Amino acid sequence: SLDEEKITGAYRFKEDEFFYLGHFPGRPITPGVILIETMAQIGATAFGIYLMACQKKMRPSEMDKALSLFSSVDGVEFKGIVDPGERVIVKGNKNYFRKGVLKVETTMERENGEIICWGTLMGVVANL
């Protein structure tokens, strides 16, 4: 779901992702940095493009001119691990969006609602 205050998205980690080979042999788990990147792609990047499109009243055909960059992460905490093949839900709640800068409180959870990790992410959005 998506509106001007929040976003919800999902991602399933494929069992053959390259990073599982070394993290860890015999017991693969999704690296924390990949979990942060997943939260950033949904919570900061996609959300930022949507908010800019709403703000500038862009048509869908103009959205390919938007550039959204993940710019910072703060206070991420991990409560669980993500196994290969697992589907996660990412939820982002807008703190603010001003002058192309988005600050969002983001959580990742399992399909059953159990929280995996959370933190504050920021992104910068520009119209090229």
Q: Where would I find each of the regions flagged by the language model?
A:
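Hydrophobic beta-strand-centered segment that forms part of the acyl-chain substrate-binding groove
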Residues: 44-89
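Generic beta-strand hydrophobic packing signal
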Residues: 2, 73-76, 119
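Active-site- and interface-proximal helix/loop "cap" or "latch" segments in soluble metabolic
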Residues: 30, 34-51
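Charged, amphipathic alpha-helical interaction segments
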Residues: 14, 45-48, 97, 111
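Catalytic strand-loop segment that frames the active site of acyl-thioester-processing enzymes
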Residues: 1-30, 34-35
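Generic structural detector for well-ordered beta-strands
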Residues: 10-12, 77, 122-124
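HotDog/MaoC-like acyl-thioester-processing domains
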Residues: 4-6, 81-128
